[in-house]
Amino acid sequence: MRHGHQPVSDFPPREAGDDECPGDKPNFFEKAFPCLYPYGRGGLESGRPVPLDFPEHVRWSLQYFDRRFRKHETFPFITFGISQRRQALNSARIQMKRSTFEREAHTVAAITAEKLDRAKEEEESGLPISDEAVRALKRHVYATAARVSGTDQARYRLRSQIWSTSTVLGPPSLWITINPSDLHDPIAQIFAGEEIDMDRFEATLGPDKTRRAKNIADDPYAAAKFFHFMITTILETLFQVKVTPSQVKSGMGVFGRVATYFGTVESQGRGTLHLHILVWLQHVPSPEEITALLKTEAFRNRVLAYIQANFRAYVPGLESAESIALLPHNNEISYSRPPNPKCEDYNGEIQRSELELARMEQVHVCKPRRCLVYDRHNQLVCKRRAPFQVANEAFVTDTGMCGPKRLYGYINSWVPSILVNARCNNDGKFLTSGADTKNITFYVTSYAAKKQGKNYNVSAVMADGYAYHLEHPKPEYIDSIRDQQRLLLFRLVHSINREQELAGPMVMSYLMGWGDVFRSHTYSPIYWGSFTNALYVAFPELSRRTQ
């Protein structure tokens, strides 16, 4: 084995000629992963009588029976990187055809290394970019990246879908966060290959906590599959929403009848996936009607009963730090099954299980590098805003402020049905007032659909990418400004993507087509420019009036 001197092409192979055998071309995957292809055959996009496209072959590989592809340290990340490069190239080609690019092509052509260096310094100083050409280039780079899965700009596009849902159905009714416990849940261990009898489950049998953690760390595919299985199961059983390719079926769930939902998937520092979801309920009064109804005691009592049934931050035993310390401490409580509804003392089992789970999953402990950050006054504060509001009883005011009973300020609220049945950390809030609804909707559109954490200067990365672009020109593109700028956009997007830090379970979600969003309905983009152009053609006086 020796290193080659030519770069490996990661674009689809060209079709073989009439006198060329498809299997004669060398295959990068067969040579780079001899442990995955021990016979030197069967690599991705290798010659075969029936062509198999790249994404489908990757999905097949990740589901291979011996799990060698999904447990490989680099195979998923390399295939995802190749997929991103191909999407970026197609996206750059689409961007070239936009009318906005036609208008700004010569402005972008005026970019120089000095302008990008100046933009880098401005970004480091926290100042806005002053050069118009650099701003135009960034707009096109971000627009190109928005069509590439896993990028920050692709997540930004989710915001318009959330706002369009609110435009059609009004403000959301519920805000819920679900954080399935992949380290200890027995279902995740089954996906990782453990033999566990769920019908005759015994917590003392099966893998111990060290082995369970190793199973999930070694198999990000199992972690991702478990997460999507759990969220789908919660939506279909507890929420009673069944989504098919042709329709959305909604029954009576724990929250009532759901009109629609929209949730975004995010990964934590150690790679665990969790969901932020907004829920719109059916037959909800308009914001104006709610404002008027909240003035009546009868309506406030109904809202109060709804909150007491579905959102809690207290059960007997969680009065203070001292009372919590007296409760049993079971770190492996998630390695269990929910109470059996057929047991004689089901209600008692539910209450005991809820207390044990709330003790382990819902008590917030502030720690540096987890939630404690420095504010602008150089003071350590909890970014989760603990301690939370304390209330002796659940409350609803005539202004719409509401909350559950909470006696200890470091208890996160929870949804009882999710806590007991999914046996994981969760949070929930019922939205009544306009202020709460606007704040939460803004949070989920700006935070839950936020960009991934980064520790790099975008302008600096673009400057390096531009320098590479100048050093490696394509002779065949010299006479075409469109081709030159398409190549520049592709290279800049690829330079930024190289700086991404994506967790293994999130990469598996993209490769398997599961994505990073749960939504009950589909969305179609509306290009408003087409409507305005049609209006100007039909009513020329509108154009003159605008001028």
Give each language-model segment a name.
Residues 1-275, 279-547:
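Intrinsic low-complexity, intrinsically disordered terminal tails and linker regions enriched
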